[in-house]
């Protein structure tokens, strides 16, 4: 009798884990992606509703680089942007919110912004964290990034495009990856970086996997989505 109960309990535990890691996780991921896509559409609709008449284009002039506008720091768990990484799929679109606590941001929302990090497009390091497994696993495929892959951050006003440069594996206490110049805390900010952090290896907290990128351009919403959004989509 006891043996049967233990076997039943074991089966139930296995089913729960299977649900948590695979079936439930896929459902959660689809929900987050759908919510982010809906938010993207809402931002575009709000822009279209308030859009002034566009001036006639000057065929003789080259498009000028646009300086990215400053964004205010978000509150804890405040959704302020979406992330698109074409390498992870054409429909990859995840919310970014303030803070990196599991309870408030990483578990219920998706991608978290380190409170002391700069905002997208600013001089310094725009640093983010997300799960690699469970809760929608936004950074599940972080190790699949390739040199020059686009990492696009969408805000209500436009898109900030970064380009992936390299991966690194560190111990959890190596916080210098979050410095204004990653891994060089003694230096002042000399560029515009993005840093993505997650746990490594899979299903472990032993290390951190870190992806670094550099800022390429800002595309205001009136110019339309950047071509980078569809580059190399899996």
Regions found by a protein language model. Give the residues of each.
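N-terminal export and membrane-targeting signals
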Residues: 1-9
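Solvent-exposed, non-transmembrane regions of membrane-associated and secreted proteins
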Residues: 11-234
């Amino acid at each position: 009798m006891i043996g049967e109960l233990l076997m039943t309990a074991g089966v139930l535990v296995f089913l729960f884990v299977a649900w948590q890691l695979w079936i439930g996780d896929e459902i959660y991921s689809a929900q987050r992606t759908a919510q982010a896509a809906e938010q993207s559409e809402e931002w575009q609709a709000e822009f279209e509703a308030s859009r002034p008449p566009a001036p006639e284009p000057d065929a003789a002039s080259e498009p000028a680089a646009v300086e990215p506008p400053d964004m205010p720091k978000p509150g804890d768990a405040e959704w302020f942007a979406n992330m698109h990484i074409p390498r992870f799929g054409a429909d990859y679109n995840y919310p970014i919110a303030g803070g990196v606590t599991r309870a408030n941001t990483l578990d219920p929302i998706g991608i978290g912004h380190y409170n002391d990090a700069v905002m997208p497009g600013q001089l310094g390091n725009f640093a983010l964290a997300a799960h690699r497994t469970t809760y929608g696993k936004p950074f599940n495929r972080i190790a699949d990034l390739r040199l020059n892959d686009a990492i696009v951050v969408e805000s209500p006003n436009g898109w900030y495009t970064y380009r992936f440069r390299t991966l690194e594996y560190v111990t959890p206490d190596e916080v210098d990856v979050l410095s204004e110049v990653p891994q060089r805390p003694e230096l002042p900010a000399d560029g515009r970086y993005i840093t993505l952090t997650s746990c490594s290896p899979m299903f472990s907290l032993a290390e951190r996997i870190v992806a670094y990128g550099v800022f390429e351009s800002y595309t205001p919403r009136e110019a339309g989505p950047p071509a980078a959004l569809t580059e190399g989509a899996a």
